[in-house]
C-alpha cells in the first residue's frame, strides 16, 4: 500500500423483506385438522388396555356428550325405562341354499338398505332351524350388527313375514311413535357414531342387543316423536307405492309380450344328464367370444320368447332408445370436504334411496371429467359394469348433479317418453342374463359400453301400453324423490333436537 493511503471500510445494510406467500386456494392443500381428546384410565382398562388412539373415536365421545347435555334430557334405548320393548337376533344355523325359486326367499343384511328389497337367495325348507323365528313383522326396526354397523330399515307391509338372515337385529318398541323417532336418530351422524362405539367411545365391530342399553337418545315429548315418526312412515309408504307402480309397469310389459315365467325358460343341452351344461355353437355365431358363458342357451331362448310378440327387437344402442351410453375412464380421485366438492358414490350404494358413505370429488381438479362423464341426470339408467354386473337404478331427482364412479355406466335415454320403459326392461329378470352374458375378466368381472349397447330391448306393438309402462316408472321415480324429502325432513328435525343443548351444560 502506498504511503498516505487510507483504509476505507464500506458497510452495506441489506433490508430483508419477507416473501408474502399466497394462501392456498384449494382446501386439499390444507392440513387435516388435528383431532384430540382425553381418555381416562378407566376407559383404557374397559377397552382391553388399548393405548393406541385408533381404538377410540373422538367424534363418538363428543357425540355422547352432546346427547347427554341435551335440553330434553336423555334416555337409554334399552332398559326398564327405555324405548325398546324387545331386541333380538336369530339363532345361528347352517343354511341350505338352493336355486329353486319355489323354495324360501331369503333376505341378507345387505338387502335392507335397498329401496326395492328383493331376496337374493333361496333356502331349502329342509334347513334345520325355526324358519318362523326368522320372519320379520310389520313395524319392526331392522339393524345390521356387523360389517357396516347400524344400517337400518323399517318393515312395512311388503316385507311382512319375509325371511331375513339371523344376523340382523330385530327391534320392537313400547310406543308406536318410538319406531320412526329411533330410526331418524340412527340415521343422524351423532346417532350412528354412538351406536358404532361403546359407552366409553371405543371402536367396536359387532353389536349385540344388550349394547343398546348404553345408547342414549334425547327424551323429547311425544308430540315431537309423533311428527318425526309420521314423516318416516310416510317416506316408507311412498317407497312401497313406488315399488307397486314398478311392479304394475313390468307386469304390463310381460303380459304384452306374453312372456313365460323366467324360471321356466331353459336352454337345451347337446347331451342331457351329463351333470354340466353343454351345447353347440356355429362358427358364425361366436362373435369373437370363445367363453362358454357368453353362449348359454337360455339367452337365445329369452330372445326368441321376447321376439314372438314384440313389434321389433332392437338394441340399447339404437338412437331411438338412448342418446349416449357413458363408461367413465379410470382416474385418480381427489376428495375434498362437503363445501368444496360434488357428492360421489359407487355401485355398492346404487340401490339405496339415500346412499351412505358419500365422498366429495374436487370440482377444481375434476370439473371436466365430472361434466362430461360422471354427472348424473334425472331418469338416466345406471348399470353396474364391474364386480357385481347388472345392478340397475333409474336416477331419482335428488341425485341430479351427483356423481357415480367409473364402475357404473350411464344410459342416457333418447327422450323422456322412453326413459322409464328402458328401466322397466333392464331391471327385469329377462334382461339381466342378456347383460351378464357379456361379462369378461379373469379376476374382476367387467362389461363395457360397446357390449351394453348390444343388449336386446323389445319395442311393443301397442304403443299406448308402452307409453303407460314408461309413465308408471317415471311416476314411481317421482315418488322416490318425495320419499327422500320426507325422510330428510325427519332427520333434519332430529338434528335440531340433538343440537338443542341444555343451558345447564
Where are these regions (language model features)?
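Short, surface-exposed loop/turn microsegments at beta-strand edges and helix-strand junctions
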Residues: 96-104, 113-116, 120-122, 134-136, ...
Amino acid at each position: 500500500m502506498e504511503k498516505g493511503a487510507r483504509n476505507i471500510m464500506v458497510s452495506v445494510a441489506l433490508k430483508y423483506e419477507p416473501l408474502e406467500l399466497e394462501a392456498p386456494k384449494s382446501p386439499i392443500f390444507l392440513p387435516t385438522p388435528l383431532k384430540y381428546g382425553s381418555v381416562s384410565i378407566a376407559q383404557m382398562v374397559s377397552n382391553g388396555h388399548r393405548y393406541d388412539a385408533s381404538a377410540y373415536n373422538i367424534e363418538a365421545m363428543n357425540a355422547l356428550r352432546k346427547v347427554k347435555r341435551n335440553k330434553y334430557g336423555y334416555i337409554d334405548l334399552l332398559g326398564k325405562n327405555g324405548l325398546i320393548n324387545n331386541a333380538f337376533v336369530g339363532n345361528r344355523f347352517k343354511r341350505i341354499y338352493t336355486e329353486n325359486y319355489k323354495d324360501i326367499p331369503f333376505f341378507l343384511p345387505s338387502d335392507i338398505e335397498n329401496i326395492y328389497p328383493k331376496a337374493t337367495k333361496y333356502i331349502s325348507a329342509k334347513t334345520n332351524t325355526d324358519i318362523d323365528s326368522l320372519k320379520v313383522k310389520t313395524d319392526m326396526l331392522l339393524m345390521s350388527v356387523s360389517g357396516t354397523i347400524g344400517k337400518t330399515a323399517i318393515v312395512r307391509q311388503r316385507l311382512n313375514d319375509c325371511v331375513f338372515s339371523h344376523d340382523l337385529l330385530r327391534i320392537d318398541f313400547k310406543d308406536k311413535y318410538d319406531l320412526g323417532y329411533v330410526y331418524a336418530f340412527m340415521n343422524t351422524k351423532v346417532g350412528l357414531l354412538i351406536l358404532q362405539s361403546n359407552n366409553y367411545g371405543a371402536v367396536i365391530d359387532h353389536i349385540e342387543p344388550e349394547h343398546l342399553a348404553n345408547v342414549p337418545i334425547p327424551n323429547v315429548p311425544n308430540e315431537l316423536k309423533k311428527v318425526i315418526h309420521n314423516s318416516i312412515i310416510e317416506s316408507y309408504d311412498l317407497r312401497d307405492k313406488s315399488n307397486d307402480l314398478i311392479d304394475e309397469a313390468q307386469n304390463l310389459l310381460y303380459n304384452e309380450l306374453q312372456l313365460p315365467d323366467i324360471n321356466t325358460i331353459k336352454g337345451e343341452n347337446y347331451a342331457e344328464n351329463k351333470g354340466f351344461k353343454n351345447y353347440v355353437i356355429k362358427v358364425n355365431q361366436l362373435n369373437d367370444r370363445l367363453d362358454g358363458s357368453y353362449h348359454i342357451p337360455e339367452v337365445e331362448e329369452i330372445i326368441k320368447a321376447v321376439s314372438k310378440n314384440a313389434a321389433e327387437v332392437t338394441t340399447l344402442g339404437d338412437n331411438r332408445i338412448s342418446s349416449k351410453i357413458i363408461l367413465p375412464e379410470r382416474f385418480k380421485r381427489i376428495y375434498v370436504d362437503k363445501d368444496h366438492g360434488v357428492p360421489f358414490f359407487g355401485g355398492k350404494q346404487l340401490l339405496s334411496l339415500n346412499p351412505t358413505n358419500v365422498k366429495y370429488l374436487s370440482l377444481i381438479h375434476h370439473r371436466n371429467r365430472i361434466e362430461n362423464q360422471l354427472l348424473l341426470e334425472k331418469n338416466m339408467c345406471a348399470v353396474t359394469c364391474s364386480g357385481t354386473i347388472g345392478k340397475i337404478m333409474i336416477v331419482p331427482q335428488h341425485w341430479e348433479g351427483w356423481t357415480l364412479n367409473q364402475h357404473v355406466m350411464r344410459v342416457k335415454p333418447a327422450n323422456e317418453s322412453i326413459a322409464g320403459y328402458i328401466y322397466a326392461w333392464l331391471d327385469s329378470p329377462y334382461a339381466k342374463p342378456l347383460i351378464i352374458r357379456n361379462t369378461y375378466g379373469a379376476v374382476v368381472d367387467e362389461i363395457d359400453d360397446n357390449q351394453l349397447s348390444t343388449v336386446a330391448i323389445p319395442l311393443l306393438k301397442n304403443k299406448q301400453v308402452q307409453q303407460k309402462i314408461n309413465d308408471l316408472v317415471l311416476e314411481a321415480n317421482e315418488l322416490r324423490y318425495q320419499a327422500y324429502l320426507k325422510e330428510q325432513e325427519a332427520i333434519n328435525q332430529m338434528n335440531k333436537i340433538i343440537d338443542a343443548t341444555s343451558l345447564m351444560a
